[in-house]
Amino acid sequence: MTGAVTSWPGAGAGRPPAQLPVPALELGEGPCWDAATGALYWIDGPPGRVHRLDVHGLHASWDVGQPVGAVFPRAGGGLLVAARDGFLALDTRTGAVELLAPVEADRPGNKLNDGACDRAGRLFAGTMAADESPGAGALYRLDADLTLTPLVTGVGISNGIGWSPDDRLMYYSDSLAYRVDVFDYDPATGAVSGRRPFTPVGGGPVMPDGLAVDAEGGVWVAHWGGSVLTRYDPAGRPDRAVRFPQANVTSCAFGGPGLDRLYVTTAGGAGGPAGGLFVLSPGVTGLPSYPFGG
């Protein structure tokens, strides 16, 4: 991989990424900006908690009773949570949880992990084995009518998903493949085709995790085990890197009224600090997080 990489302390002007004053996280994941309410959502995976930081800076959280992988606002209100048993509806007013769409009920060792919604409100998320067995997971599309369509099988750890600014490409990381791939994407139907490598990431204990795409087509990839968030240009060349105190950088999402902030989640590790939620000014605006249409 060629290309000059600018190593950033984080927020620009020599400032490191700012850690936000929210509860420590065991395995923070899945930040998602809700433009309709000006709130940021994220999850703590193993404890099964969904977190929110609202427009006034007030924190709230909900326990869904099982491990979770990601959270998405719903167009009609409330949240959709990717969890161990499938897709759950979470009523943030009452805390009530309902299983809307079971996933891989015949594979009790599997669980949903990361995901994202496209501009049309279709949700893409994948599974992984709890013991991280290679090839045990799959990638799915959940439509607004709750139709679940398998797209890719033989996945190791299904992780970050994002789209190019013109919606014609979909980026996808399978952590155990040590790379981010790219598909041709049909925004009219949600079909994917032509999977091919976009960029290798990591090796050994360092793996690609969640990702986000900016308005210039740059792909920001979290490195589990690498203490870093790296931006790759549209050709797959690394050009910026942001360092974090935790080894396990897990995911990122653009947010703020101008989509000019980048929120980053991390996880704790043996002998290191607990996971947290960070924010930085990346010097570029991002693409929005879209709500689930169902």
Regions from the language model: what does each represent?
Residues P16-V22, G57-D63, E98-A105, L146-T153, ...:
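A short beta-strand motif characteristic of beta-propeller blades
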Residues F183-A191, S281-L287:
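Short loop/turn segments immediately following beta-strands, especially the blade-tip
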Residues P23-T37, V64-A83, D106-R122, L151-L169, ...:
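Beta-rich, blade/repeat-based domains predominating
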Residues A253-G294:
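Blade-level signature of beta-propeller repeat domains, shared across WD40, Kelch, NHL, RCC1
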Residues R49-H51, G86-L88, G137-Y140, R179-D181, ...:
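A short loop-to-beta-strand structural motif that recurs across blades of beta-propeller domains
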Residues G95-L151:
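Hydrophobic alpha-helical segments and helix pairs
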Residues D34-A35, L40-P46, L80-D85, A125-S133, ...:
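Conserved beta-strand positions in repeat-built beta-propeller and related beta-rich domains
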Residues R179, F183, P200-P234:
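Loop/turn-rich, solvent-exposed surfaces of beta-rich toroidal or solenoidal domains
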